[in-house]
């Protein structure tokens, strides 16, 4: 049996001494400031002594087994103590330092969900086209960053599932565009303070997904319509495979509020206007390509109104006998749906409000970005949207339920980040 070392040479006793001195100082301050009373301090002291004594006994048991085991174990503890000392030294020299720990319990929970997601990615949905990242990718990913899709998986899925997914163009030569319209300052409504957080986070996400972002702020409904028409006419869409349209503003059931909106004189961009500008008749460069609408806005509380889409312009085309016959006999004309490949994801259900919390931005945009970063490497778009909805499933103090609407997508849309 190896002989026990003296207290002066054993790292355990040094660490116990350091811990005791530190805890004594902390407890003195807690009692002095009336944070703890005598009974509470006694209980904590007993617990601390128990931990320290058990740690000593554990090391002594190792020492009794073999001297080598004791050296290994004590060495690890000594190294930990050295790192702790170095951390405190750096803090004293350089001032407060940011320690790399999860910022909240929810962030730690997200990390656990991330790991579970990577293990069980292929079990989520029968219709889901599965991608499984290699173990190295999973273990090397940094929390709160966009997870990338492995190149070999991208090529495999793109080839084997070509008939089930929307075509994804190669990076080289691809000119994806996204539009963000954010109204922050209003003439008659409250300003949307701290909306810059949502803008920056959404812009960063879209750029990381390969989109060049066009940002427009503080527009009337007419100005928004003009910007949409100009964006729809951009030549880059011809060499693009998709687009995102993001709206962040006040809103009512009928649509997005412009900066001059008031009850007596509404200034509203209607959904039908957006869909009409980008439909297959008016925006041919995006025909058969996914068009994703993200809307962060309240949807009003008015009664007697329902959320509908009009069929203006379609009925005539379908019932005009001469036009139909002309299409049949003219080989240069093919029949096409007026509106396809759209999906709208809105921050709340009709008639209900959408919450924005201080400097952290809106709940909906925050959750949306978080789910994109976690899941778009292996899930298709609609599945990601359901992940966002699931995060709102249990009502909290701030209750809302994002809704997926006006879906005319005929295939799965994968973003394949990194490709």
From Swiss-Prot:
Disordered as annotated region, ranges: 88-113
Location of the CARD domain: 1-92
GO CC annotation, single: endoplasmic reticulum
EC number: 3.4.22.-
Keywords carried by this UniProt record: Apoptosis, Hydrolase, Phosphoprotein, Protease, Thiol protease, Zymogen
UniProt-listed InterPro entries: CARD (IPR001315), Caspase-like_dom_sf (IPR029030), Caspase_cys_AS (IPR033139), Caspase_his_AS (IPR016129), DEATH-like_dom_sf (IPR011029), Pept_C14 (IPR002398), Pept_C14_caspase (IPR011600), Pept_C14_p10 (IPR002138)
Tissue specificity field: Mainly expressed in skeletal muscle and lung.
Example GO BP: endoplasmic reticulum unfolded protein response
EC supergroup of this enzyme: hydrolase
Active-site residues annotated for this sequence: 250, 298
Any GO molecular function: cysteine-type endopeptidase activity
Keyword flag Flavoprotein: no
Modification Phosphoserine occurs at: 85
Family: Belongs to the peptidase C14A family.
Annotated function: Involved in the activation cascade of caspases responsible for apoptosis execution.
Subunit: Heterotetramer that consists of two anti-parallel arranged heterodimers, each one formed by two subunits (Potential). Interacts with TRAF2 under resting conditions; this interaction is reduced in ER stress conditions.
Protein name listed in UniProt: Caspase-12
Native organism: Mus musculus
């Amino acid at each position: 049996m190896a002989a026990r070392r003296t207290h002066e040479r054993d790292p355990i006793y040094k660490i116990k001494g350091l811990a005791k001195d530190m805890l004594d100082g902390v407890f003195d301050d807690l009692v002095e400031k009336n944070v703890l009373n005598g009974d509470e301090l006694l209980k904590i002291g007993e617990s601390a002594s128990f931990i320290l004594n058990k740690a000593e006994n554990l090391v002594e048991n190792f020492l009794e087994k073999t001297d080598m085991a004791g050296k290994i174990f004590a060495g690890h503890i000594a190294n930990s103590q050295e790192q702790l000392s170095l951390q405190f030294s750096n803090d004293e020299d350089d001032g407060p330092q940011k320690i790399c720990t999860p910022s909240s319990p929810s962030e730690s929970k997200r990390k656990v969900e991330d790991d579970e997601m990577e293990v069980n990615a292929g079990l989520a949905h029968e219709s889901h086209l599965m991608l499984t990242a290699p173990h190295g990718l999973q273990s090397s990913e940094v929390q709160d960053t966009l997870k990338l899709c492995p190149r070999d998986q991208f090529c495999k899925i793109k080839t084997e599932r070509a008939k089930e997914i929307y075509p994804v163009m190669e990076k080289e030569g691809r000119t994806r565009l996204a539009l963000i319209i954010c109204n922050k300052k209003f003439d008659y409504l409250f300003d949307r303070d701290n909306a810059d957080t949502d803008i920056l986070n959404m812009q960063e996400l879209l750029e990381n997904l390969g989109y060049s972002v066009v940002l427009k702020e503080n527009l009337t409904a007419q100005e928004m319509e003009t910007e949409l028409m100009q964006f729809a006419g951009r030549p880059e869409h011809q060499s693009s495979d998709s687009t995102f349209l993001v709206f962040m503003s006040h809103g009512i059931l009928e649509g997005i509020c412009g900066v001059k909106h008031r009850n007596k004189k509404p200034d509203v961009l209607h959904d039908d206007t957006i869909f009409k500008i980008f439909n297959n008749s008016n925006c041919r460069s995006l025909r058969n390509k996914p068009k994703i609408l993200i809307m962060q806005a309240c949807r009003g509380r008015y009664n007697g109104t329902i959320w509908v889409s009009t069929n203006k312009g379609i009925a005539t085309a379908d019932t005009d006998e001469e036009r139909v016959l002309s299409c049949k006999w003219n080989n240069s004309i093919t029949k096409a749906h007026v509106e396809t490949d759209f999906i709208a994801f809105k921050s709340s259900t009709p008639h209900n409000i959408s919450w924005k919390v201080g400097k952290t931005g809106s709940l909906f945009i925050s959750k949306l970005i978080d789910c994109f970063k976690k899941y778009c490497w292996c899930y298709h778009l609609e599945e990601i949207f359901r992940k966002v909805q699931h995060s709102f499933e249990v009502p909290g103090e701030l209750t809302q339920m994002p809704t997926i609407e006006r879906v005319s997508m005929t295939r799965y849309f994968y973003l394949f980040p990194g490709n």
